[in-house]
Amino acid sequence: METQDFIKNFAAQFDDTDVSEFTMETRFRELDEWSSLNALAILNMISKKYNIVLKADEMKTTNTVQELFDLINLK
């Protein structure tokens, strides 16, 4: 899985935040737009695009795009 593709797919789950604002260091929970709906959309995206099922509790342990990316790569 390529980091730039992951950032693009991750950013697509946000309506108001431009993809250019996302990096692997982005603390996504601190974004003004962050909500539980984004979390569900991200979990769904990971399932569909990467064929990996993450539980909400697993995602709760991550704060940055990099941490989420690393968690997915462990699966």
Language-model segments: residues:
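Phosphopantetheine-dependent thiolation modules in NRPS/PKS and related acyl-activating systems
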Residues: 1-34, 38-44, 49-75
